[in-house]
Amino acid sequence: VRQLLYPRECPFCGRVLGDVRDCPDCAVQLETLRRKPGIRLDPAQHYISNLAGAAAPYRYSGCVRRGILNAKYQGKPWRAVEMGNRLVQLAFGGELTVQYGELLPQPVPWAAIGYDLIVPVPASGKRRGYNVPELMALPLAKAMEVPLAPQALERTRAKRHQAGLPLEQRIANVAGAFRAAQPQQLEGKRILLVDDVITTGTTAAACAQALLH
């Protein structure tokens, strides 16, 4: 019944997929958008201070960009969950299977060795009623068997949109914009920080700074 009422869609183009795991329309473009030779970001090209490392499976362009924008601004939160499934697969080598029209990540408990907690970057506003990074983190938490802590970080103030700003202004824009809600519960924890988009890395670095202090 669920599959008939809410058929599974491609998170990038919206095509109804049903029991088909991967969208044939987006497969070729997604392959061209894959970061190669690996998904880890170069610290020389990104501002990722305070982070042990950072990774992004795809470049923010084409169908990937459209999928994220639709999830954020077109009221399609389930697309964020689907993209989170791709993170399980591409970042941690997890297997994905389709059961009754739903894409499900298989457990990857070995990955839990590296993290004690998964923390999504908090939403910039409450208008949409959901937080895309949190939804993307749900499949990761399930597959890795690591607790998800959506309230660990909170924003202290609104910030300007980062798009189009030079690096110096991006750094200033997010400076002090986040704080750890319950720092005593984070002490000594190995944290996986999840965001929907990383360009220069300034937002992730500001979140890491808040978690560390």
Language-model-detected regions and their locations in the chain:
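Glycine-rich phosphate/pyrophosphate-handling loop used in enzymes and phosphotransfer proteins
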Residues: 1-213
